[in-house]
């Protein structure tokens, strides 16, 4: 009989204390493949990690959005799900990685992002297909999406949206156990198995012609 993994997780914080969380290589690959769209005026939630990593030399400005008054790095205090909380037509790119599951009304947040993007602007979104309950925001951790579920959620987006899914059985198990990428054997296959997605992603463009 194959030995089952331990019931206790290896990490209680997604594997950050052990190395790179299991979902991060997929998030990095998704953003790296679409980094040409990270330019102009950009916005990201909580910090500017991905904006600066993948678009620093193409960005004119960075806005850090957070509802948390304790985040000194935030430059815009806003509830993404509150209509009108983001300025209209203010951004060329918005990056939302692993945020939507913490919002009371994900559809309202997407509407808000669409309104905040200029025509031709890009939303780069990732959401969990599975994962532990947030250790820091358990009361707000409401949602998980299959690729089909994210496709349905994005159906009202005003423009084209490409939905992709990434992960496999090994990385899904690693994520649940709190194992880091560094805990996995070096030969672990990071290819995608559509039966076992760890994250779902959307690259969505706001309809209309960019201003010249």
Residue ranges and their predicted role:
Residues 18, 134-153:
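Acceptor-substrate binding/catalytic loop of class I
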Residues 92-104:
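A short SAM/SAH-binding and catalytic strip from SAM-dependent methyltransferases
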Residues 71, 84, 131-133, 169-171:
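Feature marks short, surface-exposed loop/turn motifs that line or immediately flank catalytic pockets
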Residues 1-89, 93, 197, 207-212:
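Conserved N-terminal segment of class I S-adenosyl-L-methionine
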Residues 107-122:
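A short glycine-rich, Lys/Arg-flanked "PGG" loop and its adjoining helix->strand segment in the class I
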Residues 36, 104, 118, 155:
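Short conserved AdoMet
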Residues 33, 164-212:
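A C-terminal cap/extension of S-adenosyl-L-methionine-dependent methyltransferases
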Residues 125-127:
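Acidic carboxylate diad motif detector
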